Amino acid sequence: TSLKPNAAPPIAAAACGCFTMLYATMRSELKLQLEMFMRIVLIPLCAAGKNKASTAANGASSNSSDGFNSETQRIALETVVDLCRQPHFVTDCYMHFDCDLSKACVFEELVSTLSASAFPANGAKLSGANVLSVEGLLAIVRTVSRSTTAESSSASSPLGGDSSMLLGESSGMKAAPSTATNGFADDGSMQNDEEEEGDSPAALRDELRGLDPWEYVKASAAPSGIARARGLRKSRALKRRLVVAAEHFNRSPKKGIPYMQEYGLLPENLSAKAVAKFLKLAPGLDKEVVGEYLGDPKDFQVEVLKEYADLFNFENVTLDKALRTFLDGFKLPGEAQKISRILEVYAVRYYGANPNSCADADSAYVLSYSIIMLNTDAHNKQVKKKMTLEQFIRNNRGTNGGKDWPKETLVAIFDSIVTDEIRLTDDAAPKLSNSAWHDVMRACEVGEGKFDAPPDEFESRQYDADVFSLVWAPTAAAVAVIFERATDEDVLESSVEAFVAVARIASNHRMTDVVDHLVATMCAFVTKGAQSAVEINLLRPGVALGEDIKTRSAAKAAFAVANAHGDDLRRGWC
């Protein structure tokens, strides 16, 4: 099972250390394992402390089982920092997950979690977890910074000194309680300025050239180099469009389908096969909405359900494992007739793939329905008296074409269902189970578990702007909190250097809004510090600026950025 937030620190440390070592030595073989480890273990552990703080802020008491939360979170965050320092980790996550239509956006999830964990709870002092979260964000920025430094002749710090100090370690940071007013969201959430609605419908239709999104991505793929970078950028843009389309479908399938047709994501002459492929492969779909759509008795929806079932390969897979896979993409509706209709189609598909496994499709249907009933009985807390193995066997007597099922088949199914629940709820959080691990192993056996060749230095630079656009806002926000709450001069200087580094990367990629935002943030600190000193000590602004080290540091950073990157300042001059 996956590590829980209150897992004993030695166990968490051993698991995280083991995986870090495996990734460092066997990277090319661990694509699917990395995705599972990040989404099921590491990211939830990093977020555990934030969830606990939110509970405490809402007045809920914490029990003793939460005692290991902070230490386990620290171990997880240290593991993230170590992984982010690996040469290919950031690009691996971005290229192979965020740019893959069939995968979760692991890199974006990681950045969001680090961003949220970097901000202390209301009124709380800066903790070690907050600082480690900032270090994780800076480690990602450092990856981009190396490429920027390599291709830029002006790699030296505008403040002087070694440019490598711009993103130096911040473990020595100290904090004093204060109220953050840094111009960013208080919860550390990313303020993504990118417009999700991007291209016009006509432009996207022309780009797709009649192909569905998955055929288009396959046609645009390349093994390496600039061609691969271009293909992945197209895939990433298309994935965002699919997420928007999924949101429309989640609100109203009736309106969502015309929206997708308008953008060329579904053909004008709507086919059940195209809709089924969208329902199976598109990211961001609400499983409950998908289940209701597939269970609809209308003729077109029934055809979609049949096409949906045909997208699965059930050959040489046991009935219960195939059923798990089939039900993974949607939530079974609550209405008995809809459940029956879905299981009937599943049974026909399963029997077609495994004609020697049972007498006929009706037999597969009856056993499938019995499995659903067993699953509900075994895992519903309201059911006090659980079904026994003998009762399960008795319930299925004579249902295999009038004959009994082999006892070993029913025993194996019973044990599998009782020990490993088929999740029938719309649970967005990924879970580790025997069946999920079995799916990973099957995918590895057919060659789907390997990373592509790592990008060379030139190709890697092609992803820098995209990675930086995701990470700059939470990094700047987190560093601003560190800057505001710090009392140590070295910490202030490190924070300033980090700001300047982010500005340098933004300038290199001509992200003028980012440079404007950074300068405005530093100027806000200058104004606040000067006004506070004047009000408290009745000093003139010039004297106040000279006596307050934090205000001086902020002014120094603002002028350094303006001096070095003035060509990329727009509103920041005002």
Each predicted region: which residue ranges?
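Amphipathic alpha-helical segments within extended alpha-helical solenoids and repeat-rich scaffolds
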Residues: 1-7, 22, 31-54, 83, ...
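Structural recognition of alpha-solenoid helical scaffolds
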Residues: 18, 22, 33, 37, ...
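Charged/polar, low-hydrophobicity segments characteristic of intrinsically disordered regions
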Residues: 5-12, 51-59, 114-121, 167-177, ...
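Helix-start/N-cap signature of alpha-helical segments
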Residues: 4-16, 26, 30-35, 51-55, ...
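Boundary/linker elements of alpha-helical solenoid repeat scaffolds
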Residues: 1, 17-29, 63, 67, ...
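Extended alpha-helical scaffold segments
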Residues: 141-150, 568
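Hydrophobic residues within the alpha-helices of tandem HEAT/HEAT-like
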Residues: 15-26, 41-46, 76-88, 118, ...
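Catalytic and GAP-homology cores of small GTPase regulators
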Residues: 184-188, 192-349, 376-463
